[in-house]
């Protein structure tokens, strides 16, 4: 496909989505509009990955969780390399480490590479983890042979990379690969590329391996002036990073932040995307409204039957939310975490909310709840 001068990122996205649907290139899930599009031949395109020298020397590889990268995730696992997958929309952390069961067959590894497998066979990687990512694999809606990349418009891939820079997981020489259909390789005007946009070094399609030779610098960290207050609310780990950089003396002013009202670094609130009935003044987060005397405790329920206390402690350590004391209630499949204050407890609850151990989604609440 070719693009015309004067187009916008969104017009390029729409043109590619429409083209893939109308030419029967798109694959499940469909329609591909507003997604990183899956396509027929995605597995073949990913098959080029093990032939890259960057893949051979890599020990830890981050691959995005979208459908067209499923075979890439399998190939990483098959090669016995460490696979990191970003958590969807960064809700519960930055990424998870996929941990296949011992002696896993190829069929099991393929299951681990699916979205369900990512949920069932993973452990979270916290900000304090000394992880070093050697290779990054991302999806794209459009990409140019020069290495300019356009995502689906939500900015998560750009933000994921910037956050990895901030935590020291990647550096300016870390190669970035994208896997796309040939029709997604188009001319993109350089004027559309902004400083926070992630560029790519390799493009894998069903028929080609393109080395872009892109010399444009990749993001050197989080550009807080591009981050909205809404995004900060939705992504607890981003708020954690912001507090760290604020303490380091960096300018962390947000795009739409009132000059006289900077968000306090204390209690983290979950996004108000599920209104709660029976409360005054509108919707409330399920993490709000705990009794004062219980505000410094977090109850974690629905723990898998096979979970041991040391496993939960490891997860808490990786998330950077180790409590002062942990009360283990194994027969009830739950644990109570005791923190120094309500701010620490709310931060822990926010990071744990939605997390899975094995096949179980944890139930998290502030205060010692008896009915979980």
UniProtKB/Swiss-Prot annotation:
Compositional bias of kind Basic and acidic residues: 246-258
InterPro entries the UniProt entry points to: FTHF_cligase, FTHF_cligase-like_sf, NagB/RpiA_transferase-like, Nucleotide-bd_a/b_plait_sf, RBD_domain_sf, RRM_dom
SMART domains membership: RRM
UniProt domain RRM: residue ranges: 296-369
Lineage top rank: taxon: Eukaryota
UniProt keyword list: RNA-binding
GO molecular function ontology, one term from the record: RNA binding
Region entry Disordered, spans: 246-289
The name this protein goes by in its record: Methenyltetrahydrofolate synthase domain-containing protein
Naturally occurring in which organism (per UniProt): Mus musculus (Mouse)
Gene: Mthfsd
